Design a protein with these regions (language model features):
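Accessory alpha-helical/coil subdomains and C-terminal extensions
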Residues: 2-140
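Phosphate-moiety recognition in structured ligand-binding domains
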Residues: 150-179
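Active-site pocket-lining segment
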Residues: 140-153
Length: 179
């Protein structure tokens, strides 16, 4: 799937998670793919149908992530709605460009692994708990991982047409050139 399909997955996942969060109020953190580009995380905003729908907070890698501001944002959102749904790109980093959390492992391309381990979700959940000292706050975190770019049942019509056209072209080219 292309961007439209991946964005659809993210938006639908947040729609579902927001419904769950309404029923079981608390704080939910979802980590979305995006090492240095936040377009998939930004697509989570498509889940908003009403003013109080989540995600309430969206953090992109193109913006500096400030831990203290994050904690205050969560406190403010909880005060306003009694719940909070957060979309965080796996590539969020501090003012010095350091990732907020890593697993310490490297991927097959030699890049620091950001979201494959769930480390960022755990880090953000711990920061949320720090924001409410002495209070018992329900906090959950998930990492969408590869599902957002490969989930077969939500392929957009545009992506399906383009994939089919590329496949047809490849077969015709191979047949006409003998390659």
């Amino acid at each position: 799937p292309g961007f439209a399909s991946a964005a659809r997955f993210v938006a639908l996942a947040f729609m579902g998670d927001d419904r769950d969060n309404r029923a079981l109020q608390g704080i939910k953190v979802n980590v979305v793919m995006g090492r240095s580009a936040g377009f998939l995380t930004a697509a989570s905003a498509l889940a908003r149908q009403a003013a109080d729908d989540g995600p309430h907070l969206i953090y992109l890698p193109e913006r500096v992530f400030d831990v203290e501001k994050f904690k205050q944002d969560v406190r403010d959102t909880m005060a306003k709605y009694g719940r909070c749904v957060i979309a965080a790109s796996e590539g969020i980093s501090d003012k010095d460009g350091n990732p907020i959390s890593t697993s310490g492992e490297k991927d097959s391309h030699g890049n620091i692994q950001l979201s494959g381990s769930g480390a960022l979700g755990d880090t953000l959940a711990a920061l949320v708990k720090e924001a409410f000292p002495g209070q018992k706050v329900r906090v959950r975190a998930d990492t969408f991982g590869y599902l957002q770019r490969s989930f077969p049942t939500i392929i957009s019509p545009v992506d399906a047409r383009e994939a089919r056209a590329v496949g047809d072209y490849a077969v015709n080219h191979a047949a006409s050139t003998g390659q």
